């Protein structure tokens, strides 16, 4: 299920598996009174001394390394999710790993590491239904509406065709 939007991640993982790790949570989280099924975070330890050492050790115990980014998903949801729902959740979380680009859309590389500069990206469209109802759609909502008029690139058939279990079974 290749997505060129994530090539910057795939290229890093090819050379350095420590860029990204995945973890299962035993249940969903609740944030702002909404169920959260997945979360992408840039791994940072905002503590000192032994707390930082313990947190780093926990990551090494879990993954064998301390990742730069961690995606955690609700195992209970994933267990019952359709292939499409699961793939969409993972894809959503991967979109939170943004890559800095210049005005021409080219990836910006770090002068120190030579690697692409990444950041934790917010959502493309963050708006309330009531706000749009009252004031109308802003440019990002209008763009989303135009995109939504087209059929999705990925269908159920595409997902089944790329799944090792489905192809073998």
Predicted stretch roles:
Residues 1-80, 100-169:
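Metalloprotease/metallohydrolase-associated module, dominated by Zn2+-dependent proteases
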Residues 88-100:
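Active-site recognition of the HExxH zinc-binding catalytic motif
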């Amino acid at each position: 299920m290749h997505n060129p939007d994530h090539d910057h991640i795939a290229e890093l993982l090819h050379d350095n598996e420590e860029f990204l790790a995945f973890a299962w949570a035993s249940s969903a989280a609740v944030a702002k009174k909404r169920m959260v099924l997945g979360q992408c975070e840039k791994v940072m330890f905002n503590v000192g001394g032994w707390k930082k050492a313990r947190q780093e050790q926990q990551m090494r115990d879990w993954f064998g390394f301390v990742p730069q980014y961690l995606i955690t998903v609700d195992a209970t949801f994933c267990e019952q999710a359709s292939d499409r729902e699961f793939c969409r959740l993972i894809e959503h979380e991967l979109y939170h790993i943004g890559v800095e680009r210049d005005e021409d859309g080219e990836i910006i590389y770090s002068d120190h590491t030579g690697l692409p500069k990444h950041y934790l990206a917010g959502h493309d469209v963050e708006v309330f239904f009531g706000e749009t109802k009252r004031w109308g759609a802003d440019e990002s909502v209008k763009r989303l509406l135009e995109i939504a008029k087209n059929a999705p690139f990925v269908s159920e058939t595409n997902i089944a065709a790329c799944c090792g279990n489905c192809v073998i079974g």
